[in-house]
Regions:
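Accessory alpha-helical/coil subdomains and C-terminal extensions
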Residues: 103-179
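Internal gly/pro-rich beta-alpha loop/helix module
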Residues: 54-132
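Short, charged beta->alpha transition segments
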Residues: 14, 38-43, 170-173
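Structural motif
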Residues: 23-24
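Short Gly/Thr/Asp-enriched flexible loops that form oxyanion-binding sites at enzyme active sites
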Residues: 27-50
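Loop/turn elements at helix/coil->beta-strand transitions in domains of secreted/extracellular proteins
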Residues: 50-51, 179
Length: 179
């Protein structure tokens, strides 16, 4: 819960500065704000053609039954995976958790008590890990342009989420918008 937009900027800067040195990136992250970070990075890294995989664990990595070791090892394997032409199999920002690789900007944390904590409700999983990793290639975004990576650092944090419903009063909206 300590993650803030300044830290997203730092992550983008680190990825941009090291982009040509690595085939992919794995970010170890706390679970409470992981989906927010993944979504933000997906929009801040324009022209991405390498994997950026966020992962973490429900139990600390030193605990006997931790899910962290498997999440980390599989994230590294996915981040390094390439096709026969040497291109990344998953060139986008993702979350890997409990055997599922999900698009970063389509993932939500749903459960703080189970290992299967994240879901992608409006988009299918990009890969599923078992004995083998099965990639859902038809759903994976591929950057077909030859655009170089463009990092975006400007973020507007003056936002509000307004849920509309039948019967909402105009004065409620005006108060929330400060007008």
């Amino acid at each position: 819960s300590d993650m803030e937009p300044d830290m997203w900027r730092k992550l983008v800067h680190i990825i941009h500065e090291n982009y040509d040195l690595y085939h992919g990136f794995v970010i170890l992250h706390g679970t409470d704000t992981m989906a927010y970070t993944a979504s933000a990075l997906s929009f801040m890294l324009e022209g991405l053609d390498k994997p950026v995989i966020l992962t973490g664990s429900q139990l600390p990595i030193g605990v006997l039954r931790t899910d962290g070791k498997e999440n980390l090892m599989t994230s590294i394997e996915i981040a390094a995976a390439q096709d026969k032409e040497g291109k990344a199999l998953v060139p986008e920002v993702c979350i890997f958790f409990e055997n599922h690789l999900m698009r970063g900007n389509r993932t939500t944390k749903m459960n703080a008590e189970n290992f299967n904590a994240f879901r992608s409700f409006n988009y299918p999983v990009l890969a599923e890990a078992g004995i083998h990793i099965k990639y859902n290639q038809a759903q994976i975004h591929v950057n077909k342009s030859k655009q170089e990576l463009v990092p975006h650092y400007l973020l507007d944090t003056n936002i509000v989420v307004l849920k509309l419903f039948p019967g909402i009063q105009e004065n409620v909206i005006a108060t929330m918008l400060g007008t």
